[in-house]
Swiss-Prot record:
It catalyses: RNA(n) + a ribonucleoside 5'-triphosphate = RNA(n+1) + diphosphate. Keywords: DNA-directed RNA polymerase, Nucleotidyltransferase, Transcription, Transferase. Belongs to the RNA polymerase beta chain family. It comes from Xanthobacter autotrophicus (strain ATCC BAA-1158 / Py2). The gene is rpoB. DNA-dependent RNA polymerase catalyzes the transcription of DNA into RNA using the four ribonucleoside triphosphates as substrates. This is DNA-directed RNA polymerase subunit beta.
């Protein structure tokens, strides 16, 4: 536990009892693995896998022209390095992407006009640029136009075949109508369904239905083949007085005898009329030797003939296959001498006559008719020809260009239909369609089960890579059409591949996907947890998915297969509930896109440490025990009956039947839910709110990790990328607020730099305007291992997620101020900036080139006082550090005005001063209302070729200095490493040559070396060739590293000095970042982790707050009535355990005081050992204990993992250890009277978050502002600086009070009476208090509208 660099500084006491054998996978692996598989950036030796981009190119190429005289082949692709790195893209508003270069080969053929034989005439190969492909950042996001976006994974129905019924809803009788649907990955859907009359129909792409036999005719089957495919034949032989039928007990089980059943050989009655033939009786009769039964003519009537009965001499058909036998038929057959008739095995009990009835009902009788019918359904209005109908039918299901089941679809189909077909066959086969129809008919006969479409074996995940692959294929197919046309229109002998390719459609498809797809979302960057959750989200919405309106209850519901795969708790409240889910903590997505959960294998009742990942389909076959089943020390089950999950049910089974066991109790829930301590004590609805609200917690100025955590905090901080982890093991060389330099000590590869420089983000703006700020945790000389946390980010503390603060809470009412979930706070909280957060707002000003002339960014603004310009520099841009308020100028800008006719005075001025006086207007960027803050950053962007102003040059110089310092530091460490290595090699060796003044054959020592400048050390030579070769290698490596370092520096400087790519018409752009400090205030929303949310109602002076016996004031008072009805008792347990944490912290603080007094570490070590146990503390060195003690003063942090955490007894034990009352309650005194309250009160530490719903962002008041163009009424909404709507009901209220004048004002001068508004202003200026109301503009609009309808309305004076 405590072996990491930060883990040793503050150890969490862990309550979990279950050993975790599997490491939790990286939390953003879903995104990274999928996109890496799509790109396959590095080409391996044997070539790339047929996956992702490679698969797309292979499926579209080769492209041949229409005549077949030339062909364009795909050879390979490679990525060039991206033009800008991640930070540059963020700042410049660019997309972080790499150019894709594809090598194409154009082959031109000579075609012999007579034979049509082809011979290669010419082959040309060329690299062609085919647009940029966005790259994923280290944290699993994309940067598109300067903003971070996430591609959410989509859950959709897996390709394959599904059997279902309508649940009796279609027909009034409630009859179940069965249906099968074959869903491909790409191509036409095929539905096969029963109607109410039990006729089987097929539908293609949900169009008009056709009898399924027409589909079978189109597949090349005839009547007889269709019947023989779906039915067995029974040969009936004529005998004296009836017919002989072979006896088959399996076939005849459940047969109810209409007449006596008679043995054909002996004449005995084997079953009396009216009785049923049971399975047992049938088997006994067969054993007794019953071979055949005698059947009367009456019983033959109603059977169906299995084959065409044809007179071989004349060719006359006496009876057709499928024809029902009647008395007439029997007579005819008797006359024509048929003694043996093959009959279809249809008994209407076990086997129904559905296919035979469909044949009879089908109007089509030949393949041609069927093909024409299908053609008319698919392309109504077009006259069919046999060739076109055949080609169209083939292209529907059997053409790999148009139809793709995908490997997943084929695997699913094989499993469902018990077929054995390789997953490379991705089109339908005849056997597939026949198997589907056969299975459907069996379902109608009562054999088999329908599928559950909400089972996770039938739903799969499309991650980034796959979504991008589909989009890229769309772009390439658009390009293919253009290439084909161009190949036939140009002189193919002279063109190169480059001339045929236009990469625009591909680039547009990619851009469209990242810019406007429903699954490409603006990343929720409120805090690290919200980032991680966003990347692990699964959405059922989006293209090809469900829509909110159509999704029913079943799709949204929790399914047994969600266990360990999808979190049953975390989903949004509202219309998207259940459609947007979160991946469970240990879940992963396999190569087919199915979600897998990990399990420990159980062998002979012994649980092993082998971890197996199972998909939902595989898991259904096994018995799976839960993670909290008690085991003995050998890993065997202690109990005789084990609770197991099997095929969606929960059962009790013997230990020897258990196959697998859960890996961890928290594999059930998502990351956010796994961060809630005592989750098992909360109601699910509140847990849902708790996990959703943690994502809205604003990063605080000084956040704290929770005293009561779950052990997941460090994992989230590490995987989110908010905290910086060391890339390599090494020693800290330099640290300051903006960067950390680490000298790598274990780098074996000499070609890699021995230095890692980590740039820390300082006061950067996130997507949600929260503040991203990183702080170093290391000091110079510290040794860190790979993966250790070296800097905290937003909402992290000592490498652990810290979304809020631990505050002292009392659960009690307080003068009604915590009525209905309101929260009462102490003034201390506001004063000490406990819940203060910094928000960074971004404002931008653009200087455009207008028709009247260019706009200008300047300090010289007309009609503006010097006072208003006090924060601007000479370039007209605000200083960094300036305090600004609403209305202050951030960037001075003037825009040319249209030429207006000049007055004689202006002409005179122009003649005297020779300049335009004031033909510009002020369009400066001002701070909007409701904002005050400090300028933290200014960025200036200039178009290429535009002269940079002083401010832009100053920013550029500063940036170059920063880059130069990085280069110099890296160079210094490189020098130190290389020359240190030289000293080690040369020290003690005899030199045969050296610099000027050095005597040969002298032993080189460190002292001698220090007499010469370092650059001359290379001149020393020794006799040993091996050493000289090593020196040469080091020298070459050193020179190469220096050159690379310098080149990197020059490239970056060149990028800086080069102009920026700005939108068309923009000459210059200035971005200003304002940091706004938001203290907590009444109206802000706060919440705990258990769904206990509320709004701050009042901030009370410290002296009025309730206080404990030692005089400590509580920080926050919550209403106890908010707990019982909500059933989120977890918050009370957290409070008790938090109280114990703080008590133990006070004990550690006392031990620390003793250490500072006597320098004796023993009391501290003893105290820590009683808290954590000996094993944990023994690993720590003496030097590490004081720092640990200091970090524990405020409280000893504890981890209580979900479903495996502290129990009531554990909490009581900790309270007793801390010397506190085991009830967790304390006597509180009223701050206003000093009297104790009548009863003891639950007091403790609870973790509270400040949420992103801040009152400052919501409250708003309008003075004078913009009006709507047509109605002249004030606009609405805070963003438009709008007014409050005085609506219908408000008008009723004034009418009810008879406030006539107020009402008239509201409807006229305070709204849209334009002339009246001006008159009111004038009257106020003159000091009068009377004015007249005119006609509201909206009335004029109504009049105009009526006139437009031809009704003339005139207003008469009355």
């Amino acid at each position: 536990m405590a072996q990491t660099f930060t883990g040793r500084k503050r150890i969490r006491k862990f309550f979990g009892k279950i050993k975790e054998v599997a490491e939790m996978p990286n939390l953003i692996e879903v995104q990274k693995a999928s996109y890496d598989q799509f790109l396959q950036i590095e080409e391996p030796k044997g070539g790339r896998d047929d996956d992702g981009l490679q698969a797309v190119f292979k499926s579209v190429f080769p492209i041949s022209d229409f005549s077949g005289a030339s062909m364009l082949e795909f050879v390979r692709y490679e990525f060039e390095p991206p033009k800008y790195d991640v930070d540059e893209c963020r700042q410049r508003g660019m997309t972080f992407a790499a150019p894709l270069k594809v090598t194409l080969r154009l082959i031109v053929f000579d075609v012999d006009p007579e034979t049509g034989a082809k011979s290669v005439k010419d082959i040309k190969e060329q690299d062609v640029y085919t647009g940029d492909i966005p790259l994923m950042t280290m944290n699993g996001t994309f940067i598109v136009n300067g903003t971070e976006r996430v591609i959410v994974s989509q859950m959709h129905r897996s390709p394959g075949v599904f059997f279902d019924h309508d649940k009796g809803k279609t027909h009034s009788s409630g009859k179940l109508l069965f249906a099968a649907r074959i869903i491909p990955y790409r191509g036409s859907w095929l539905d096969i369904e029963f109607d109410a009359k039990d006729i089987v129909f097929a539908r293609i792409d949900r169009r008009r239905k056709i009898p399924v036999t027409s589909l079978l005719y189109a597949l090349g089957l005839d009547n007889e083949e269709i019947l023989s495919t779906f039915y067995e034949k029974i040969p009936f032989t004529r005998e004296k007085g009836g017919w002989r039928m072979p006896f088959d007990p399996k076939r005849m089980k459940g047969y109810k005898a209409v007449a006596d059943l008679i043995d054909a050989d002996t004449g005995e009655v084997v079953l009396e009329a009216g009785k049923k033939l049971t399975v047992r009786a049938g088997r006994q009769l067969a054993e007794k030797g019953l071979k055949a039964l005698k059947i009367s003519d009456e019983e033959m009537i109603g059977q169906y003939i299995a084959e065409d009965l044809v007179d071989l001499t004349s060719g006359e058909i006496h009876a057709e296959a499928g024809e029902e036998i009647t008395e007439k038929t029997l007579k005819l057959l008797e006359e024509t001498g048929y003694n043996e008739i093959p009959v279809l095995d249809i008994d209407h009990v076990n086997t129904g006559a559905y296919i035979r009835n469909t044949l009879t009902a089908d109007k089509n009788v030949t393949r041609e008719d069927a093909l024409f019918d299908i053609y008319r359904v698919m392309r109504p209005g077009e006259p069919p020809t046999l060739d076109s109908a055949q080609a169209m039918f083939h292209s529907l299901f059997f053409d790999s260009e148009r139809y793709d089941l995908s490997a997943v679809g084929r695997v699913k189909m094989n499993m469902r239909l018990d077929l054995d077909c390789p997953d490379t066959v991705r089109v339908l086969r005849r056997d597939d369609i026949l198997s589907v129809i056969r299975t459907l008919v069996e379902l109608r006969d009562g054999k088999g089960e329908i599928d559950d479409i909400d089972h996770l074996g039938n739903r799969r995940v499309r991650s980034v890579g796959e979504l991008m692959e589909n989009q890229y294929r769309v772009g390439l197919l658009r390009m293919e059409r253009a290439i084909k046309e161009r190949m036939s229109s140009v002189d193919i002998d002279t063109v190169m591949p480059q001339d045929l390719i236009n990469a625009k459609p591909v680039a547009a498809a990619v851009r469209e996907f990242f810019g406007s797809s429903q699954l490409s979302q603006f990343m929720d960057q409120t805090n690290p947890l919200s980032e991680i959750t966003h990347k692990r989200r699964l959405s059922a919405l989006g293209p090809g998915g469900l829509t909110r309106e159509r999704a029913g209850f079943e799709v949204r519901d929790v399914h047994p297969t969600h266990y360990g795969r999808i979190c049953p708790i975390e989903t949004p409240e509202g219309p998207n509930i259940g459609l947007i889910n979160s991946l469970a903590t240990f879940a992963r997505v396999n190569k087919y896109g199915f979600i897998e959960a990990p399990y420990r294998r159980v062998v002979d009742s012994k649980v092993t440490d082998e971890v197996v990942y199972l998909s939902a389909m595989e898991e259904g076959k096994y018995y799976v025990a839960q993670a909290n089943i008690p085991l003995d020390k050998d890993g065997r089950f202690e109990e005789d009956l084990i609770v197991c999950r099997h095929a969606g049910d929960v059962l009790l089974v013997a230990p020897d039947r258990v196959d697998f066991m859960d890996v961890s109790p928290k594999q059930l829930v998502s990351v956010a839910a796994a961060l809630i301590p005592f989750l098992e004590n909360d109601d699910a609805n509140r847990a849902l709110m708790g996990s959703n609200m943690q994502r809205q917690a604003v990063p605080l100025v000084r956040s704290q990790a929770p005293l009561v955590g779950t052990g997941m905090e460090a994992v989230v901080a590490r995987d989110s990328g908010a905290a910086i982890a060391a890339r390599r093991t090494g020693v800290i060389d330099q640290v300051d607020a903006t960067r950390i330099v680490i000298r790598a000590t274990e780098e074996a590869d000499p070609s890699k730099s021995g230095v890692d420089i980590y740039r820390l983000m300082k006061f950067q703006r996130s997507n949600q305007s929260t503040c991203i700020n990183q702080r170093p945790l290391v000091r110079v000389g510290d040794q860190v291992k790979k993966g250790d946390i070296i800097a905290d980010g937003p909402s992290t503390e000592l490498g652990e997620l810290a979304l809020g603060r631990n505050v002292l809470v009392a659960f009690m009412p307080w003068n009604g101020y915590n009525f209905e979930d309101s929260i009462l706070l102490s003034e201390n909280i506001a004063k000490e900036d406990v819940f203060t957060s910094i928000h960074i707002e971004e404002f931008e000003a653009m200087a455009r080139d207008t028709k009247l002339g260019p706009e200008e960014i300047t300090r010289d603004i007309p009609n503006v006082s010097e006072e208003a310009l006090k924060n601007l520099d000479e370039a007209g841009i605000v200083y960094i550090g300036a305090e600004v308020r609403a209305g202050d100028i951030l960037v001075g800008k003037i825009t040319p005005k249209g030429e207006s006719p000049m007055t004689p005075e202006e002409k005179l001025l122009r003649a005297i001063f020779g300049e335009k006086a004031a033909d510009v207007r002020d369009t400066s960027l001002r701070l909007p209302p409701g904002t005050t803050g400090t300028i933290v950053e200014v960025r200036v962007f200039n178009r290429h070729g535009v002269d940079k102003d002083e401010r832009a040059l100053a920013i550029e110089r500063e940036e170059i200095e920063r880059l130069a310092k990085d280069r110099d530091d890296e160079q210094a460490i490189l020098d130190r490493n290389v020359y240190g290595r030289l000293i080690e090699i040369l020290d003690g060796k005899t030199a045969i040559a050296g610099p000027k003044g050095f005597r040969k054959e002298t032993v080189v020592t460190r002292e001698i070396l220090t007499e010469y400048p370092r650059s001359q050390w290379w001149l020393f030579a020794v006799a040993d060739d091996a050493i000289m070769a090593e020196l040469e290698a080091i020298r070459a490596q050193y020179d190469d590293s220096k050159k690379r370092l310098e080149q990197r520096f020059l490239d970056k400087v060149e990028k800086l000095q080069r102009g920026d790519e700005l939108p068309p018409g923009v000459m210059k752009m200035v971005k200003v970042f304002v940091a706004v400090k938001r203290k907590i205030q009444p109206g802000d929303k706060m919440a705990g982790r258990h769904g206990n949310k509320g709004v701050v109602s009042r901030i009370v002076p410290v002296e009025d707050m309730p206080f404990l016996e030692d005089g400590t004031n509580v920080d926050i008072v919550l209403n106890p009535l908010g707990v019982p009805s909500r059933m989120n008792v977890g918050q009370i347990l957290e409070t008790h355990l938090g109280w114990a944490c703080a008590g133990l912290g006070r004990q550690v603080a006392a031990a620390m005081e003793a250490y500072y007094g006597k320098q004796d570490l023993k009391p501290l070590r003893d105290r820590l050992e009683t808290i954590y146990g000996k094993d944990e503390i023994e690993q720590l060195k003496d030097g590490e204990l004081p720092e640990l003690g200091e970090n524990l003063r405020k409280g000893v942090p504890m981890a209580t993992p979900v479903f495996d955490g502290a129990h009531e007894a554990d909490i009581e034990q900790q309270l007793e250890k801390a010397g506190l009352d085991a009830s967790g309650q304390s006597t509180l005194y009223d701050g206003r009277t000093g009297e104790p309250f009548d009863r003891k009160v639950t007091v403790g530490y609870i973790y509270m978050l400040k949420l992103h719903h801040l009152v400052d962002d919501k409250i708003h008041a309008r003075s004078i502002g913009p009006y709507s163009l047509v109605t002249q009424q004030p606009l609405g909404g805070k963003a438009q600086f709008g007014g409050q709507r005085f609506g219908e009901m408000e008008v009723w209220a004034l009418e009810a009070y008879g406030a006539a004048y107020t009402l008239q004002e509201m409807l006229t001068v305070k709204s849209d009476d334009v002339a009246g508004r001006t008159k009111v202003y004038e009257a106020i200026v003159r000091g009068e208090d009377t004015f007249e109301s005119g006609i509201p503009e909206s009335f004029n609009v109504l009049v105009k509208e009526m006139r437009s309808l031809g009704l003339n309305v005139d207003l008469e004076n009355s």
